[in-house]
């Protein structure tokens, strides 16, 4: 598997999130997929986990997202510099820089957060699958909590 194919997979994955096509996004994830959002608190001197879900928990979370009060804008994820940092057989660890913007309904755009994705990607006969994603945010003060995967 070449790095260009892995990068294209991750770009498509981000585009599905940008379009809020969550069912299609989840289809790209393995059955044992795990998702975590974390950051380091300078004040506490330790990491903080803001979200930690498996695939079924995330699916339930997304099914109910519109039943709760949500921000009115949409998030747009911009990925940069995906690098394969580890490889074992058909499994790849990929670190990617990410900038997340929020586009309000009136057209205003603001930076939501920056950080990195550490993805584990598995090559299967049916194609690539995301087996885990850890979002490590450098930004620690968000305008609003993440109602959808960032």
Curated annotation (Swiss-Prot):
Alphabetical UniProt keywords: Dioxygenase, NAD, Oxidoreductase, Plasmid
Pfam families: Ring_hydroxyl_B
Keyword match Transmembrane: no
InterPro entries in the record: NTF2-like_dom_sf, Rng_hydr_dOase-bsu
Thermal characteristics: Optimum temperature is 35 degrees Celsius.
SUPFAM superfamilies: NTF2-like
Induction info: Part of the abs operon that is induced during growth with 2-aminobenzenesulfonate (ABS) as carbon source.
Mechanisms controlling activity: Inhibited by o-phenanthroline.
Domain of life from the UniProt record: Bacteria
EC numbers on record: 1.14.12.14
Similarity comment: Belongs to the bacterial ring-hydroxylating dioxygenase beta subunit family.
Protein role: Beta subunit of the oxygenase component of the 2-aminobenzenesulfonate 2,3-dioxygenase system (deaminating) (ABSDOS). Can use 2-aminobenzenesulfonate (ABS), benzenesulfonate (BS), 4-toluenesulfonate (TS), 2-nitrobenzenesulfonate, 3- and 4-aminobenzenesulfonates, 4-chloro- and 4-hydroxybenzenesulfonates and pyridine-3-sulfonate as substrates. No desulfonation of ABS to aminocatechol or aminophenol detected.
Stated name of the protein: 2-aminobenzenesulfonate 2,3-dioxygenase subunit beta
Species of the source: Alcaligenes sp
Gene (UniProt): absAb
């Amino acid at each position: 598997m070449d790095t260009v194919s892995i990068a294209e997979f991750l770009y498509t994955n981000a585009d599905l999130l940008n379009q809020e096509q969550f069912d299609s996004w989840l289809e790209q994830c393995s059955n044992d997929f795990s998702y975590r959002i974390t950051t380091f608190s300078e004040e506490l001197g330790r990491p903080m986990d803001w979200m930690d879900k498996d695939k079924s928990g995330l699916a339930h979370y997304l099914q109910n997202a519109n039943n709760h009060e949500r921000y009115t804008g949409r998030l747009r994820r911009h990925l940069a510099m995906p690098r394969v940092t580890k490889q074992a057989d058909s499994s790849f660890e990929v670190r990617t820089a990410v900038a997340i913007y929020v586009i309000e309904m009136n057209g205003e755009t603001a930076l939501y957060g920056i950080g990195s994705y550490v993805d584990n990607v598995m090559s299967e006969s049916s194609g690539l699958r995301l087996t885990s994603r850890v979002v490590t945010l450098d930004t620690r003060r968000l305008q609003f909590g993440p109602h959808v995967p960032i």
